[in-house]
Amino acid sequence: MRDVAVIGVSQTKFGELWDVSFRDMITEAGLGAIEDAGVEGADLDAMYVGNMSAGLFIKQEHISSLIADHAGLTPIPSTRVEAACASGGLALRSGIMAVASGYHDIVIAAGVEKMTDVVDPTPAIATASDQEWEAQQGVTFPSLYAMMARRHMYEYGTTREQLAMVSVINHENASNNPRAQFPMKVTVEQVMNSTMVADPLRLLDCSPISDGAAAVILCPADMAREYTDTPVYVKASAQASGTIALHDRRDITRIDATVNAARNAFKMAKLTPGDIDLVEVHDCFSINGILAVEDLGFVEKGEGGRAFEDGMTRIDGDIPVNPSGGLKARGHPLGATGIAQAAEVVWQLRGEAGKRQVEGAEIGMTHNIGGTGGTAAVHIFSR
């Protein structure tokens, strides 16, 4: 197996992009990554695109061919990858494996979602849950994560204020991210007084409905410096599955897919949680920021809330979490999220993150899950 490097990244602004089409968003991200990498479209051997539900959001399937055609990249092989909200992370992993195996040399891995072209995106999002046991019974993702939050509060004493701090820190970071959907700060009081969605989760505990796209260019590590002076190396790419339905979990305060993917990633990279300088976690709801730092091994079980409350997860803390603003404030266009996380880590390791830069960052991690944790992808990168 060959070592793999990231030589180019790009991300559109995330938000309610009414005047930008699905086709133009993904083309903007792809061409931006190609330019950043210093390659030509003709250099690309293959494309992998993460997308959860274009068929429901924009009534368009067969998007792999559509994107290659619209971007002027035909006839390269183009493959759509779907794993709910982890679609981007698995598209990245597919591209990494294609290069590592020697099957392709230069690959683009991208992600895109256009969520605002429907009146109500909830039915499309609900397809990421168990249809028979959850969606058809009226269960929504806010209510599922609310149950996880309530149980964590019961088991470990996690407080409402600690949940709010996840959002506060994300917005603090996003205020320095020009690509973020919500680049403004919020207070604990604002989070706790926002509209109730599913007790104990309020509106400002929840990631938004977003449009956006992101892309990365991958190549063999020994070729990377032919294109860039600042390659970022893939140290590990791991994926795990878990139960899709929440009621099947042995413990709803732990996402087993995250635990297993992280364990495999650390083993592959020959690293420990203490070696990580920053991490982009999948905080679709505030409780998942807390669960993520526990399941990834950064703190002991039950200590996640305290880590946010004490400032451990701030940019200048022991383990900076979501310098981009995370899903909560940067935005969460489902299929693009896993790629956008990787782009942020690359910018951080290059020292190109501006006011949100983690000082001296050498090693970064991304954590991307689907649904309530039926799928997890964990990647580790280094300078």
Swiss-Prot record:
Coiled coil: none
Pfam families, per database record: Thiolase_C_1, Thiolase_N
Pathway field: Metabolic intermediate biosynthesis; (R)-mevalonate biosynthesis; (R)-mevalonate from acetyl-CoA: step 1/3
GO molecular function: acyltransferase activity, transferring groups other than amino-acyl groups
The EC number(s) this enzyme carries: 2.3.1.9
Catalytic activity: 2 acetyl-CoA = acetoacetyl-CoA + CoA
Name listed for the protein in its UniProt record: Acetyl-CoA acetyltransferase
Upper lineage: Archaea, Methanobacteriati, Methanobacteriota, Methanomada group, Methanobacteria
